Amino acid sequence: MTVNLSTANEFIARHIGPRQGDEQAMLNSLGFDSLEALSASVIPESIKGTSVLELGHGLSEAQALASIKAIAARNQLFKTYIGQGYYNCHTPSPILRNLLENPAWYTAYTPYQPEISQGRLEALLNFQTLISDLSGLPIANASLLDEGTAAAEAMTFCKRLSKNKGSHAFFASQHCHPQTLDVLRTRAEPLGINVVVGDERKLTDVSPFFGALLQYPASNGDLFDYRELTERFHAANALVAVAADLLALTLLTPPGEFGADVAIGSAQRFGVPLGFGGPHAAYFATRDAFKRDMPGRLVGVSVDRFGKPALRLAMQTREQHIRREKATSNICTAQVLLANIASMYAVYHGPKGLTQIAQRIHQLTAILAKGLVQLGLTVEQESFFDTLSLHTAGRTAALHDKARAQGINLRVIDAERLGLSLDETTTQADVETLWSLLADGKPAPDFAALAAAVTSGIPAALARQSAILSHPVFNRYHSETELMRYLRKLADKDLALDRTMIPLGSCTMKLNAASEMIPITWAEFGALHPFAPAEQSAGYQQLTTELEAMLCAATGYDAVSLQPNAGSQGEYAGLLAIRAYHQSRGDERRDICLIPSSAHGTNPATANMAGMRVVVTACDARGNVDIEDLRAKAIEHREHLAALMITYPSTHGVFEEGIREICGIIHDNGGQVYIDGANMNAMVGLCAPGKFGGDVSHLNLHKTFCIPHGGGGPGVGPIGVKSHLAPFLPGHAALENKKGAVCAAPFGSASILPITWMYISMMGGAGLKRASQLAILNANYISRRLEEHYPVLYTGSNGLVAHECILDLRPLKDSSGISVDDVAKRLIDFGFHAPTMSFPVAGTLMIEPTESESKEELDRFCDAMIRIREEIRAVENGALDKDDNPLKNAPHTAAELVGEWSHPYSREQAVYPVASLVEGKYWPPVGRVDNVFGDRNLVCACPSIESYQDA
């Protein structure tokens, strides 16, 4: 008997949905006898053979977990007092288990379909309420990428809104976190903004500035009263942004109360691990008058078609996918999973618990300071929250060495001073250890005596007087039982990958395997400070080095930066690399970016941020780039041509055959080619952008490489470049290349990189290629099954699509009055998340099934779409009323079902249109949400829900 003793490649069948027999049946329906034959037909001749991925074996799940455990063990976990915007904290176990580790939360998509997203929308509304309450500003968004990028967004926000229109200078306090200042400088330079860093206490003339950024408390620990300075800036028509510590705001006068126009910062210390720098949720709050200029997403209260309160993403017309190069920001994701952790941390602890945590940290800091003075050390701060700077003169270097020998990290400031930041995890024993470390032989202070005598380090003028978190949601769920049930109740309202396929085109909602997710909650990855000494992060260095090599192999590029913490940031970093390359050659005049008309709105928004002028090129009737129009515009602008941004496979879901020619045209006219990697899931192992003409691409690790979407973030958007662009990859103060940071931490959202490392390691090169082939097979199977019911808008010359297909519903709108929205909402009644609506073409649905979906699930979706087409036909021929029909009224709720029924169609047709739903039915918690009402009556914080329910 021959038994296969190898466990190699066992994961591939776990990741890929179709079984072997089903795979062959799908191939037969397309007229192919093998995956290789299908691939050969889909991939254009001009780019065949460009893949450089070695088709090796994948590790078993057990082997991969053992390997990454060994890597994690190389990280050294010291007791860290570095601070600087990153603080250790406790993630409450019920939040860890019921939210962070729960696929109902982490596999969900951005809540663009509000009827199936009420749970996480409520959690995000809690987050917005938390931020609004603590900051003292009425409007807060649903999170941004990190504190550094939030500060950069605040700077450009001030530039747009300041009445000091002639100014191009932005004042940034020298007391801001250094990494924030670095991100500001990167963002400012292409926009012609001059960032002036200085000591706000010595600022005499504020008239040159359109805005200012102040840190509260200061990075070194000082607490300044900014009231008078804020008034001076306002008198000069400048806006004031304040980077504020969220936990400190439970004790401090909030920025909104001393006149700030914007408050930004990080919610990391609300239960989110350090994670070597990320991912963490940043926040952004502002005045009501400025809400339409605020970057990022905003959850608002509206009503459904029954008049019942319902939540939705508000004011989306201000976002980049609508406004393109006129957008206020290129941000198209948030940090929803992390914002929801912070939200639930506040819900669990409540106002009293949060205040107690802050008071304990502050009290320990005050006791520590008193003891240090007793020991003869000079503490620079007279007022503080949790951070102290010590003047240690010639002892500084020796003290750092002594501390590290004891497993302690202190903050490195300069040769004369060091810093200490306490946090939620600090204890009395820790304070006594610090005294011992710094005592220089002197007897230790008496902790109890100092604790009895110590006074607050917060001046009375800065002590918070206003109440926080009075809404019932922050005052109810303080037992674990209550919180567990609240999280379950919210999760049950939503549709995520744990229940159903999410066939969103251009979003790649594939499996996020449990084995890939397990390492992210290990302390070896989660408890490391991003600015810990390099020798303590050997595991992360190995992980990132190996992952960069893996991504180079998958793309054909020569170098990779993992720093960008979203696809939008990757785009931005890629265009900055192109810009810097041209400048290094004396080609400063090259500032034209060609972008096809079909491009995602992020592309032109990013080009604008990178200081480039956008020239739009045409597409032909098949949806491909019009090569002759591209050639004409490249020649017309050849003296100023910087770049082409193009998505491949195309935004229309097709492998364009002219891609090599397109790249050649740009290169011949002095430009660089940016290939947007949003659709990389169709290419891995089959062709490589770095080998068929791309100079730079960003990848979406949250699409192609299995990092979950988290309900709207986190994402990771690394960029791959050819060797000539490698010197211009993002730098960071903690790296060898110090310049060009695009986010606050050197490796961005480092703690979720193990997910991609695990995926690639378990799939191996052969598995990655097979995943691409199955993604193409699944998309073409759906396209073929549905083409006789709905026109497939674009195909290649062979009649095939890439990894997604676009169904054209516009003729049905004309014949029946049924819109793409009606079909999307009707799919909810069948238990499906809708495909991507009206992108890249209005009135269409773009479907991307990914390789992870089984034939059964594909058939279930196709059956639903075919049944919906039959319902549309019934509207067309008059069998169903054109206004009162299952599509116009979708989705149908349980409350409607048991209420008085007045529709001319049956209850059964409404909620059980196919028999399989009887076995397991998803019930939407609300009916169709009224978008217009929500924007006209904008409410973005919690109290209104109660008032609406009482009304």
Swiss-Prot record:
Gene Ontology cellular component annotations, sorted alphabetically: cytosol; glycine cleavage complex
Entry EC number(s): 1.4.4.2
Keyword Transferase tagged: no
Keywords annotated in UniProt: Oxidoreductase, Pyridoxal phosphate
Catalytic activity: N(6)-[(R)-lipoyl]-L-lysyl-[glycine-cleavage complex H protein] + glycine + H(+) = N(6)-[(R)-S(8)-aminomethyldihydrolipoyl]-L-lysyl-[glycine-cleavage complex H protein] + CO2
GO molecular function, one term: glycine binding
Secreted found in the keyword field: no
Cofactor(s) demanded: pyridoxal 5'-phosphate
Listed GO biological process terms: glycine decarboxylation via glycine cleavage system
Top EC class, one word: oxidoreductase
Record-annotated disulphide pairs: none
Tree of life domain: Bacteria
Residue numbers bearing the N6-(pyridoxal phosphate)lysine modification: 703
Membrane-crossing segments per the record: none
Family membership noted in the UniProt record: Belongs to the GcvP family.
Function text: The glycine cleavage system catalyzes the degradation of glycine. The P protein binds the alpha-amino group of glycine through its pyridoxal phosphate cofactor; CO(2) is released and the remaining methylamine moiety is then transferred to the lipoamide cofactor of the H protein.
Protein name, UniProt field: Glycine dehydrogenase (decarboxylating) 1
